[in-house]
Regions:
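Conserved, mostly hydrophobic/aromatic
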Residues: 19, 32, 43, 91, ...
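C-terminal alpha-helical cap/extension of soluble enzyme domains
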Residues: 117-123, 127-133, 148-151, 157-161, ...
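Conserved N-terminal beta1-alpha1 strand-loop-helix module at the mouth
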Residues: 1-68, 74-75, 174
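Active-site mouth loops of central-metabolism enzymes
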Residues: 10-26, 69-73, 151-164, 224-230
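N-terminal amphipathic alpha-helix/helix-capping segment at the start of soluble metabolic enzymes
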Residues: 1-20, 134-149, 206, 212-213
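Conserved anion-binding
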Residues: 78, 90-173
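Catalytic cores of alpha/beta
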Residues: 30, 34, 70, 75-89, ...
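Alpha-helix-loop-beta-strand connector modules within alpha/beta enzyme cores
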Residues: 51-85, 107-115, 144-148, 195-219
């Protein structure tokens, strides 16, 4: 395992740059490394990532010094553990609506004594290689502490219920921070299809302000990201517009 590259960038006094994937594409990870991205994020809630693909994504990204974070499909502990066992070093839990749900998220991501993460035998625990665990970390307990230090745990606040229960969510010790979900949040506030509605914008600002006051991160405090859809719909569209009337000869 490598040091969390997002946290490493933060130690340098800067936000990490993150390239987001919605489906497995190893060549994109290599190109992301070539242009200087710090980390990779995969969207397991709306994307499609078989377990074997997550293994490969982490393997390639880590080889270039980039950590991989993920939004998981759901917040069940077994589901989160499948991602962590592949080598994921940051988890965003979608639709966290209560303090109990935030606590369960943190517990699933962090080893005891900070949490209740199950010990596996995959990449995420150095294949349970006792020699490596002893030499690099001073044993399993040392690895567990190292892993917890290098884990980012984020609750996605995208429902009015979560906003109502925000104080309880922010009180969870193992939670690193919160992020938003403008479309679903707007919908829960009665404004479907209006992610930029003033009420949603104000609600998200309130969430992030209170998170920072509680010692957590909010929104894009520690990283800034872009995905292939934004690149294609932005830069690629500009390219087509600039060249679609080019003449032959």
């Amino acid at each position: 395992m490598i040091e969390n590259s997002i946290l490493a960038a933060n130690k340098e006094g800067r936000k990490a740059t993150v390239f987001a994937l919605a489906h497995p594409a190893l060549y994109m990870i290599e190109m992301a490394a070539h242009v200087g991205f710090d980390a990779i994020n995969i969207d397991g809630e709306h994307g499609g990532f078989p377990e074997e693909a997550i293994d490969d994504i982490c393997r390639v990204a880590n080889g270039y010094g980039m950590s991989v974070t993920a939004r998981v499909p759901d917040n069940a502990a077994y589901q989160i553990n499948l991602y962590l066992d592949r080598g994921i070093q940051g988890v965003t839990g979608p639709h966290i609506n209560s303090g109990a749900e935030a606590q369960a998220l943190a517990d699933a991501c962090l080893f005891p004594v900070d949490g209740k993460r199950s010990w596996g035998g995959g990449r995420g625990t150095e294949f349970n290689d006792q020699t490596i665990l002893d030499e690099k970390y001073g044993g399993k307990l040392g690895f567990a502490k190292w892993s917890n230090t290098n884990m980012i745990v984020v609750a996605q606040i995208e429902d009015k219920k979560a906003w109502d229960n925000l104080d309880d969510i922010l009180a969870v010790p193992g939670l690193s921070g919160v992020t938003g979900g403008p479309h679903d949040f707007a919908q829960s506030l009665g404004h479907p299809g209006e992610p930029d509605h003033p009420e949603r914008v104000a609600a998200t600002l309130d969430v992030e302000t209170r998170a920072r006051a509680a010692g957590k991160t909010g929104g894009g405090d520690i990283s800034t990201g872009i995905g292939i859809a934004e690149l294609m719909l932005g830069e690629a569209r500009a390219f087509v517009a600039a060249h679609k009337n080019d003449k032959l000869g």
